[in-house]
Amino acid sequence: MENLQLVLFVLGAIAIVAVLVHGFWSIRKQQPKSLKESPMTGFYKDQGATRDHQGFDADGIGQVRVRKGSPISDDERAEDEIDFAPKEPTLTSEGQMDSSVRQDENVAEAGDDFSLSDQPKQRVTRQRQEPVLSAEVQQEEINQMELGLGQEAAPNQSSLFESTVPELSPEPEPSIEVPEPVSEPVLESVPEPEPVAPEPEVLPEPQDVLVLHVVAAEGEELNGAELLPSLLSLNFKFGDMSIFHRHEDNAGTGKTLFSLANMVKPGVFNLDDMEQFTTEGVVLFMTLPCHGDPLRNFSIMLNSAHQLADDLSGQLLDGGRVAWCENTKQNYLQRIRTQNS
């Protein structure tokens, strides 16, 4: 076991040393070589020795020579400088212009005789001279130009206006006719006749009364808390004489068709005490003659009595408190026909 550990330790040390050596070798290889170590250095040295007796190499390129120029004096430097300052033009004569032209021709001829052996001449800067016009001469020329233009433009303008502007003849003033005021007819307001309210239909003295009774079962009473909702669902309305009435309109308006009262004296109801109210029965009655169709009114009263008996678990009786039957119904209808005939 100890020998195995020693072998592993030696192998690890060898691996570490190999990694370090390889790293240094890689870094050394990647570094750029200096000019002294470059293989092209000897090539350039050998090329310097292969030149002919005139100093040219195989490509015909000679050695670089540095020549010092002759010193330039201050006077020559001042003459070479270009004067950019504006100068006032002067008026030159024809003789001066001719001399300048001859001087230019001489310079051109001298340029043709130039050779390589001639020494370079100093450059002479020639100043350009422009004619100067005095203020008086300029003003006179301007005045003459204005006078000439004004004389030529004046007739043209006058003829232009004469040809373009037409002669306007005075137009006659339009005569305005003032219409005479027309008197509008005065409308007299005619008072509309007030609608005449229809006189209420006056019924004659009652000739007959049709009566129906709705009574509770034997030994029981009708409860006011159940009676009031049933009456309202049948379109009865509490009104005159503290009893309920059925009108022409289901909303409780119009003429009274028939009425409903308490069967127990005094025959009235108290709405504030309807929940505690109890009675043995109620009575429905219709007078003849009546408003509207009596047959229709009786049919509505009979249907309402049947509905109350069903809602309150009561019994329907005739005017003599006898159970309602078909013969009693035919008797009531005959009484209605008798009143209409």
UniProtKB/Swiss-Prot annotation:
Residues 175-190 have a biased composition (Low complexity). The keyword Transcription does not apply. Residues 28-341 are cytoplasmic. Residues 192-201 have a biased composition (Pro residues). Residues 90-100 have a biased composition (Polar residues). Residues 35-134, 157-201 are annotated as: Disordered. InterPro entries: Cell_div_ZipA, ZipA_FtsZ-bd_C, ZipA_FtsZ-bd_C_sf. Gene3D superfamilies: ZipA, C-terminal FtsZ-binding domain (3.30.1400.10). The chain crosses the membrane at residues 7-27. Keywords: Cell cycle, Cell division, Cell inner membrane, Cell membrane, Membrane, Transmembrane, Transmembrane helix. It is found in: Cell inner membrane. One of its GO terms (cellular component) is plasma membrane. Its main location: membrane. NCBIfam families: septum_zipA. Essential cell division protein that stabilizes the FtsZ protofilaments by cross-linking them and that serves as a cytoplasmic membrane anchor for the Z ring. Also required for the recruitment to the septal ring of downstream cell division proteins. Interacts with FtsZ via their C-terminal domains. This is Cell division protein ZipA. It comes from Shewanella sediminis (strain HAW-EB3). The lineage of its organism: Bacteria, Pseudomonadati, Pseudomonadota, Gammaproteobacteria, Alteromonadales.
